[in-house]
Amino acid sequence: MLKKKAKTKSSSKKWSSFKNARSMHVLLYLLLAAIMFALLFVHVKPETLDLDLFSVSDKTIYAPATVEDQKATEEKKQAAEDAVEDQYTLKKEYTDNRIDLVSSIFDSISEVKKSSEEGSKSPSEKSMVKSVKDKLTSDVNDSISEDSIKTLLKADSEDFSFVRDTVITAVNTVMSSEIPSDKLSDAKDKVEKELKSNSIPSKYLGAATEIGRFAIIPNYVFDPKATEAKRQEASDNVQQVQIKQGQVLVEENDLIDREVYRKLELTGLLNNSNLFKPISGLLIMIGLFIATLVYYFEKQKQNLKFKNQSILLFSIITTLLLVIMEVVSLFQKMEYNNIGYLVPIAAGAILIKLLMNERIAILGSIILAICGSMMFNQGVTGTFNYVIGIYYLISGISGVLFLGKHNARSKILQTGLFVAFINMVVVLSLLLIQNTALSGLEIGTLMLMGVVSGFASSVLIIGLMPFFETGFGILSTMRLLELSNPNHPLLRKILTETPGTYHHSVMVANLSEAACEAVGANGLLARVGAYYHDLGKTKRPQYFIENQMNIDNPHDKLSPQLSKNIIISHTTDGANMLRSYKFPKELVDIAEQHHGTSLLKFFYYKAKEKGDQITEEEFRYPGPKPQSKEAAIISVADSVEAAVRSMHNPNPERIEKLVRGIISDKLQDGQFSECDLTFKELDTIAKTLCATLKGIFHSRIEYPEATKKVK
């Protein structure tokens, strides 16, 4: 039996040390990430189908994502290229070349004429023609007849020059226009027409026409580079052919032909090879969630144990809501996929706010909204149902903001009512924005779902709060109200065993609550902390003056050192008793810290008078000093109440002087050095305590003592 007990104690010790270990929160982050991945992957994993070519589809199949249809895109690009006509370019240099050619023909004839005129012996016509032809290229000789050469050789200088200029002008005019190869004949006819219209003597017209027609060639020629550039431009302007997300690939009872089968393959519906992207994306998103949480929690000034507890608490609430969403999502169908509106999503954010704080609650709302938009994505195009995501986000954040700084049970119910109203309005607005074709009955049903979600959130919160408070030792308003019940065993113990201490504690509670509320601290925590701050006095009630009724003071018979030990021990005794009753740490701290390290002056000076060799440190409380505003304010209220109670004929001036003196002494003694009270707040505390004490110790009418008896 002893062995088993030792083993249990050892394992408990190991768990406690692990709970305080830095590796604990790393493990919690990894565990939360793994749970998120397990619950979300099934909703982002692409659907795969077992279908055969030329089979009949048993359902309408939609494209799960937008993908490019490369085959169709290439076909469209090729069609665009084929539609581009050949590109031609007007070669202006061809005009100059042909004019030069015409000039060279006339120059050759002119040279032969000049040579024959200068010679002593006139050459024969035949030899002159031969001389001209020798000067011309073969293609010119093939195109220009000897008769034309002879005619021009016989022309006088004036006619020769006129014919030359007229042919050059006509060629230039015709060649200045585009002459494609298929229009060459028309261009030659045009130059002939030009020549005929220029009054060339009839005997030269044939020769001029022959040279003019020969000079005309196609100048509007095919340009391969321009054609290729145009085709490339046409190809580049073709938009990608895409299979859009949500596009119908095949209708129910339709044949799956080769084209449909190709599209099913293209969208990844026939194989599992396209898992890399969704897995990677989901891991990145979860990584961002965890990184944000790490950043938030690492900034919190908490010891390792409470940081681990906060992470665990957040993880449990988040997992709980994810599981609820997963269960509800099992009932969604293609024809009715709006069941997600029923999820009490606000419960998660409000629970986090009640048990932790508002900032992390809003972060939790964002994470749950994104996760919910993935879980309820059936029947929508894409992985995310943005409508449900917006609904979840507004629902969660509105609940957190409406709750504010209050968390009484009645306020939670009011918050549920408010969230129900907000949900109803959000559902209606989203449906109107979508311009949905739903009937009035269907819209009403969805709005009713939002109302149910709001009420369910408040019920879930009230039901779960006690479990979280007990399991994590969290101090909430409901827990404080429960501990402030006069029927609590420890309060009954204080009342019955130390009635003077009980009355003192109630007075301190009233004072400290008012002071805390004046500086923005937790007034209810201060009230309940004050009720239990002197619990340790129940161990030796008669040694404390407020409980010494009709008995001698036992300290008169004790040494100052022994009296000091008895008085000082009440802080640690009280803290230990509260721990044994599993009280929240905040209340234990108040019991332990309400005297800080202050000096027990009465017994210190008594010992000094006796001549004992002592130091101040021996007569100081062990501390620690107050760590919170509430503990510091209770320490002031405790001293003030005791001092004012012992004051003879208290009046406002004397009370204020006493209060400010006590605060000043504690400040100079360094009792506030470890809490975050400011000088301004200390002044506010002094004013509030004075005002409260003046109300308690106000002047009363002095009734004369009845000294005469009625005869």
Curated annotation (Swiss-Prot):
A cellular component term, taken from the record's GO annotations: plasma membrane
Chain segments annotated as transmembrane: 275-295, 311-331, 336-356, 360-380, 384-404, 413-433, 448-468
Stretches for region Disordered: 114-133
Reaction(s) the record says it catalyses: 3',3'-c-di-AMP + H2O = 5'-O-phosphonoadenylyl-(3'->5')-adenosine + H(+)
Residues that hold Mn(2+) 1 according to the record: H504, H533, D534, D638
Membrane topology designation: Multi-pass membrane protein
Mutant phenotype after disruption: In strain 168 grown in minimal medium and glutamate, 3.5-fold increase in c-di-AMP levels, while a double pgpH-gdpP mutant has 4.2-fold increased levels of in c-di-AMP; double mutants die on solid medium after 2 days.
Molecular-function GO terms, alphabetical: cyclic-di-AMP phosphodiesterase activity; hydrolase activity; metal ion binding
Keywords noted in UniProt: Cell membrane, Hydrolase, Manganese, Membrane, Metal-binding, Transmembrane, Transmembrane helix
Function of the molecule: Probably has phosphodiesterase (PDE) activity against cyclic-di-AMP (c-di-AMP); may be the major c-di-AMP PDE in the cell. In B.subtilis c-di-AMP is a second messenger that mediates growth, DNA repair and cell wall homeostasis; it is toxic when present in excess.
Full protein name: Cyclic-di-AMP phosphodiesterase PgpH
